[in-house]
């Protein structure tokens, strides 16, 4: 709990009835990056679930999607549903957080087909054909636009022995492992804000640095 504000933690969990007992409206304002396993949309689902079950109105403040100019990747199979993938959508889904909330309602993905009382405050003058550069990093491990663009691809390495640079100044812009024998780049992950115990902490990793690639050549 945030003791200074009395706000509860809803990460990886649905808000409890006790937490919501004096609440009439919830305002959801998070910067998503348009990727299925970036878990802000899972948190959104849990919040919508709780709002639907407790007759609480939800206001979503929409934001541009920095990866909203394309759609890519396979659709999730329901048998693999988890907190890092809750819905049958592509890896890069192309929607803003407000559009995604509307889809959750429209597809009746909430428990028992419940519908959340939802109001989306839309973005003015935004369209998906224009790339949007984020003015503020959405999280400590996505510190710049290169990391945001590479995240949909490099995140798959997190299920392997490969480090994606957590615990460095360039997460999701490099990759490597102590077990790789060849590579043009070396780095050693350390404990940092947002990466207290990164993979291969304190161990030299060999791999590649992607910070200077032409991101357009990957699409």
Language-model-detected regions and their locations in the chain:
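Glycine-rich, charge-decorated loop segments at or immediately adjacent to ligand/cofactor-binding or catalytic sites
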Residues: 59-81
């Amino acid at each position: 709990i945030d003791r200074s504000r009395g706000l509860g933690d809803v990460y990886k969990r649905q808000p409890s009835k006790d937490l919501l007992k004096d609440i009439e409206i919830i305002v959801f304002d998070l910067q998503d990056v348009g990727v299925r396993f970036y878990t802000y949309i899972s948190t959104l689902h849990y919040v919508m679930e709780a709002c639907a079950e407790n007759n609480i109105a939800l206001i979503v403040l929409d934001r541009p999607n920095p990866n909203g100019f394309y759609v890519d990747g396979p659709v999730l199979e329901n048998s693999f549903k988890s907190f890092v993938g809750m819905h049958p959508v592509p890896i890069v889904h192309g929607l803003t957080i407000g559009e995604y909330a509307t889809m959750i309602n429209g597809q009746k993905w909430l428990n028992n087909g419940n519908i959340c009382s939802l109001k989306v405050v839309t973005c003015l003058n935004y369209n998906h054909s224009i790339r949007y550069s984020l003015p503020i990093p959405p999280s400590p491990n996505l510190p710049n636009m290169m990391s945001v663009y590479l995240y949909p691809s490099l995140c798959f390495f997190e299920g392997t022995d490969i480090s994606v640079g957590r615990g460095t100044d360039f997460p999701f812009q490099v990759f490597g492992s102590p077990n790789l024998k060849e590579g043009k780049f070396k780095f050693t992950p350390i404990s940092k804000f947002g990466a207290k115990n990164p993979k291969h902490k304190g161990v030299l990793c060999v791999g590649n640095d992607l910070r200077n690639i032409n991101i357009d050549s990957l699409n």
